[in-house]
Amino acid sequence: MKNDKVTPKKEKPKENLTVEQKVRREIIAWFWVGLVFLLINGAIGQARVIPSGSMENTLLIGDHLIMSRVGYDAGIPFTNMHVPLWRNPRRQQIIIFKPPFDPTQPDYVKRAIGLPGDTVDIHDNAVWINGQKLIENYTLGKTERIENSDVKMPYKVPDNCYFAMGDNRQNSYDSRFWGCVPRNDIIGTPIVIYMSLNASPEAWQPGQIGERFLAYLNGIIHPGTVRWRRLFHVF
């Protein structure tokens, strides 16, 4: 007869770790998680929050975005340095960039309207590119020139530059005021809205840590302040 007995597998001896060893293991594990997050956050993508209404109604105050840097810019972790890459914005694509007139300010979010070499003009409540009217179904308010601006129309976009405008045309500080955005200042484009809170605009201004904390706390206590329909909108 065949031997039907099954030889039991030997169990691996359990690790008898001290509390100190367990704590050390957890710290090391979370260290690597944090390091990977920082590398991804700096080099591949970043989170952004919309502090103003210049892109309404495409983007609302309190919209929280994930920005992709892939192909546009490589951030160097733990530094403020960045390296422009190979990808260039398409016409009418939303872009995120360092303000060329003051790179120390928070990043701007606008729409790329004029590409390098384009001639941009504004009249009859519309943007004209190289003599052709640009079809725009996302704007809010009248599209007008800025009187007494140093940017004169028609405007020839220089090489390696982009003419950027906010969708909220009467409430946007954009290329009509200060000229083009150099390609090297463009760091990415939004890919998804992961959170949107209807809170005081002051909460989303730089340095308003207390106000921002209260906005998040209020969102937890009062879920009605979350704009649920905007969540996970993909660009």
Where in this protein do the model-derived segments appear?
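Soluble "head" domains of membrane/secretory-pathway proteins
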Residues: 2-26, 43-49, 54-235
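Hydrophobic membrane-insertion alpha-helices, especially the h-region
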Residues: 28-43
